[in-house]
Design a protein with these regions (language model features):
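Tandem repeat scaffolds
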Residues: 1-149
Length: 149
């Protein structure tokens, strides 16, 4: 494919199931987009940089991508794969992370304070100085099958 998108914005687009093999996304912002099932992990790694606002990203994959400081704002991210992803200092503002998979994901300094429905194992994901709300603590203890009231 080898398409290059640099310093651009996609607004009100339905790009669901788009094949991005080898595509370069450099400083690309998606606003109010439907991006279901996209394999962002197949994009070119060099200078990969994206941000998302008011978008649907359900069933997409960012596995093994380097995405420090990425901003996800008011997004649905159900069943998204973040396996092996570097999300250092990323922000998940008002995002639904139901069934999102975090495993060997770099989460140092990431901000989950307004995110919800996440389940993250602190033992399997480095998360030094990551930020969570008190309501979100349950999502960090899920594997222990304990009741918090």
């Amino acid at each position: 494919c080898n398409n290059i998108f640099m310093d651009c914005e996609f607004i009100d687009c339905n790009l669901s199931m788009t094949q991005l093999i080898g595509t370069s996304l450099k400083t690309v912002h998606f606003r109010n987009c439907k991006l279901l099932g996209i394999e962002f992990h197949s994009c070119a790694d060099f200078m990969f940089g994206v941000s998302f606002q008011d978008s649907l990203l359900d069933y997409s994959s960012f596995a093994n991508k380097k995405m420090p400081k990425t901003k996800f704002n008011t997004c649905s991210m159900k069943d998204v794969s973040f396996i092996g992803t570097n999300l250092t200092n990323a922000t998940f503002e008002n995002c639904n992370l139901d069934n999102a998979v975090f495993n060997e994901t770099q989460l140092a300094g990431a901000d989950f304070r307004t995110a919800y429905n996440y389940k993250i194992d602190p033992e399997a994901n480095p998360m030094r100085k990551a930020k969570f709300s008190t309501q979100g603590i349950v999502g960090l203890l899920d594997k222990y099958d304990i009741k918090i009231e």
